[in-house]
Amino acid sequence: MTHSLKPWNTFGIDHCAKHIVCAENEQQLLSAWQQATREGLPVMILGEGSNVLFLENYAGTVILNRLKGIEVNETADAWHLHVGAGENWHQLVRYALDNNMPGLENLALIPGCVGSSPIQNIGAYGVELHRVCDYVDCVELETGKRLRLSAAECRFGYRDSIFKNEYQDRVAIVAVGLRLSKQWQPVLTYGDLTRLDPKTVTAQQVFDAVCHMRTTKLPDPKVNGNAGSFFKNPVVAADIAMELLERFPNAPHYPQADGSVKLAAGWLIDQCQLKGVTIGGAAVHRQQALVLINANDATSKDVVALAHHVRQKVGEKFNVWLEPEVRFIGQFGEVNAVESIA
């Protein structure tokens, strides 16, 4: 007996898992993990499945993290939020705004659960989670021991954290602590936000602008399955960026604190005239080249073949090799996404 994963991944790819367990508290989560381990089965914890591509049937247990709850503690200079890992991220952003606690508005409409946000160090429109993260509460899967990691201990990087490295498969995130400063500073560095006046802008206006940009440019997973940005924006050494800018002076580029330069993957893909290109049922989205969609009952093989095609075309034209932001899940767990599409 297997269970379809189609409802549990926003790509809408039809693979199955041996077991699917919905965990509403820590004990259920630990029990499901320990049961699978006793049976010698692989086990993975999933939020809303908005950043994964299942490559094949999963041979083990998928645990859906549904630990809920939001607690707010106000101090003189900040609001401190303690949020269950199974809460929906966008609903949290709305909750904070509705209660006059700004600071999350640039991250509106990012799909997925709160517990996934530190794994990827989610970011959009100039703000990353690390800017507001205070701590992450996890439970050690083998021992059931509680751990609280400070933001520094999470080792946040660009779409990266300790949870994608040493702590992968070792801990389950059960809650995230956020600190929203009362000295709100709007971040207006990207897209339509640059048109807003920092002196008069409200957090609600930033939220509305972000929602407008996302809904007009990004496909709704309920209509066309997708996992948001498929590729990371490449971060390259300064000399490589200089070389590229000599050939393409209008290429969007964002110098980083360490001297490297972040390029816009969507722009690179667009320059290769790849919008609308299809392989099987998978397609490059016509409005936002960074998004690959399930246009017509795509298989995971279609998506992988399309990602490979996009990577090759961009690499040949720019000598910049894109890496997936989406996590690839094989029969026994996560596999190397770059190798899968190389």
UniProtKB/Swiss-Prot annotation:
Membrane-crossing segments per the record: none
Enzyme category, top tier: oxidoreductase
Keyword Cell cycle: yes
Cofactors named for this entry: FAD
Domain of life: Bacteria
The species this protein was found in: Salmonella typhi
Principal location listed in the UniProt entry: cytoplasm
Subcellular location: Cytoplasm
Domain FAD-binding PCMH-type: 13-183
Annotated catalysed reactions: UDP-N-acetyl-alpha-D-muramate + NADP(+) = UDP-N-acetyl-3-O-(1-carboxyvinyl)-alpha-D-glucosamine + NADPH + H(+)
Catalytic residues (UniProt): 159, 229 (proton donor), 325
Database matches in InterPro entries: FAD-bd_PCMH, FAD-bd_PCMH-like_sf, FAD-bd_PCMH_sub1, FAD-bd_PCMH_sub2, MurB, MurB_C, MurB_C_sf, Oxid_FAD_bind_N
HAMAP family tied to this protein: MurB
Family: Belongs to the MurB family.
Protein name in the entry: UDP-N-acetylenolpyruvoylglucosamine reductase
EC number of this enzyme: 1.3.1.98
Xref: Pfam families: FAD_binding_4, MurB_C
Pathway in which the depicted protein is active: Cell wall biogenesis; peptidoglycan biosynthesis
GO cellular component: cytosol
Function: Cell wall formation.
UniProt record, GO biological process: cell division; cell wall organization; peptidoglycan biosynthetic process; regulation of cell shape
MF annotations from Gene Ontology: FAD binding; UDP-N-acetylmuramate dehydrogenase activity
Organism ancestry: Bacteria, Pseudomonadati, Pseudomonadota, Gammaproteobacteria, Enterobacterales
